[in-house]
Amino acid sequence: IFVYVKLTEGKNLLLLTMMKKEIKFSLVYRDMWQSSGKYQPRVDQLVRIAPLIVEMGCFARVETNGGAFEQVNLLYGENPNKAVRAFTALFREAGIQTHMLDRGLNALRMYPVPADVRRLMYKVKHAQGVDITRIFCGLNETRNIIPSIKYALEAGMIPQATLCITYSPVHTVEYYAGIADQLIEAGAPEICLKDMAGIGRPGMLGELTKAIKEKHPEGLI
């Protein structure tokens, strides 16, 4: 499909700006690991698909573990630690960054995890080949996220702090931008806009991205 676009400074400033920037893609999974069993991959299947992802040549990052990923390993009777090493190996060789999901205060669980265990978790995951951790709290409670940012940095990982997006009179651009300020000030070099339910309004998300970038131009969103 070929699309002809007449470029003018007035009407297509955004497109012109994007053309001057390097665009990278990150492969992120959502509900596959949380759906019915037939869609939950075993480690032998992940290892088989990894070369194809590399061969595509369009991904700078690939999500490889954390959260539901490692719970599925346990359900299959697999060792999550061995699974992480096996799945990340080829991506590391290809120079593709790998990233995981963690639940802040809850780490990879559904209930709070002691601070010393969380600190050790990041060291272990980094040693297993994981570069980035996407840290989120469903309540956007910064006290559940900021300690994990610091622990991840100590372990040599890149902490990607998350804003869980929803739609209500309370959840405004100012609300989210204020949280982003706190997370970036705590050391997070990246911010993720996590629209788990798919109800974020494009206009609001655009305004939020602009607000964060204007105040933190070096940050990655």
Language-model-detected regions and their locations in the chain:
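N-terminal amphipathic alpha-helix/helix-capping segment at the start of soluble metabolic enzymes
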Residues: 16-36
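Short, well-ordered coil/turn segments that N-cap beta-strands
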Residues: 21-23, 58-60, 92-98, 129-132, ...
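Active-site beta->alpha loop and helix N-cap motifs at the rims of alpha/beta catalytic domains
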Residues: 66-179
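Targeting/processing segments of secretory and organellar proteins
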Residues: 8-10
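Short hydrophobic alpha-helical segments enriched in small aliphatic residues
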Residues: 3-5
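Catalytic alpha/beta core domains of metabolic enzymes, predominantly
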Residues: 196-221
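Catalytic domains of carbohydrate-active enzymes, especially glycoside hydrolases
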Residues: 48-65, 124-132
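Conserved, mostly hydrophobic/aromatic
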Residues: 32, 135, 191
